[in-house]
Amino acid sequence: MVILTPAEELGLSGLSLDSRLRKAFYGMPAERVTEIAARLNAEAKALDMCYWRDGSADTIHILMRPIGVMPDQLAYLNYVSLTILNALKRIPDLYLQDFAVRGIVPLTPPEEKWLWDTWTPSHRETNPVLGRLDAVVEFTSPMWKDSLRFMEPNLCGVGGMHLGPACERLLADVVMPAVQEVDPELQMEPGQDFREIFIQEVLDHLQAIGRAGQNIAFIEPKYSNQGTDEQEPLAQYYRERHGLTVVHADPSELRIAGGEVMYEDCRIDVAYRDYEVRDLIHLEEQQGVDVEPLRMLFRQNRMISSMAGDFDHKSCWELLTDQEMTQKYFTAEERQIFRRHILWTRVLSDRRTMLPDGEPGDLLKFVGEHHDMLVLKPNRSYGGDRVIIGYATDKAEWDREIEQALADSEPWVVQRG
């Protein structure tokens, strides 16, 4: 007799749930599926779930079949994610005190000046970071915990704040009633509404820094007409649901008056940004935008994410998978989480380092010989830009990509796939 661990039993429960969902969809008449798809599309359009391209809005397509997650699985994901996020929040202080850290997560000189000018003891006490950690996991596997792998952090201007909760609500309101027509006993509910989690974090942060007001600014390239359109629907949600004053601003629309940051006639108490600091520097240097209001918000710890958000380099994972660094800066419990769930990642360069097997070795030699298990990525790019998947390339092409990455003025990372 084989005795399963609780985690294995939970994974098999996830498999059973997934099987019931599949069976329910197989049992639906084709016309019912077509009806659901049409309604999802109409509801998504009504909720401004759009992606803008060159001034034209495309409604985002929602996949109908939900992914089922057991409560204990969700709790474990939260535990691991918060452990990693809290470690990442400490990187600005590590950067300021350790030159080795600066080599792994380098800032440009103007970015570093922003850090020195705006990072204060207040940030060490309460450090607001809104992040998304990109990961893969197989909930239906008996070994589902071991399948959880974090690929990279996104700690500034993350997408999905409006789209995620809206999508879950549509699945609950449109799809699940149809599923229960086939399987009445199958009960599923949406996860916690991220919009509510976020606004509570904002209000808690205002209280922690002693700021009495609750006027919030969402700051993004307001007039770009490119990408997702989330901040205005999100602002409208908070106005209607919570009665909060929430404004939607472009950086050029902020000013300082009487020692306060203002948008039109509204005093700003806290701001959420969809800009990296290097983008703000570009606005100042290339377009002449006055970014002093934003610098003030950073300095007074009234910007979400703090400067910690600008350390969401893919090379962060080297800090968390290098034994020398983790022994120096992180607890045994944190190190265990990192070893189990974070993909081995290194800044690509000609050096010796700890390899995935735990032994020191020549990095470039290892990368050249093991392309079938590795991925190359620009360190600070996003959106799948120039990601090279080793097993999808031949050896000659892989070697060319390595040479080009080493010659690039911007750092690249290599990661175990």
Segments the model singles out, each with a brief description of its role:
Residues 1-417:
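Preference for protein termini
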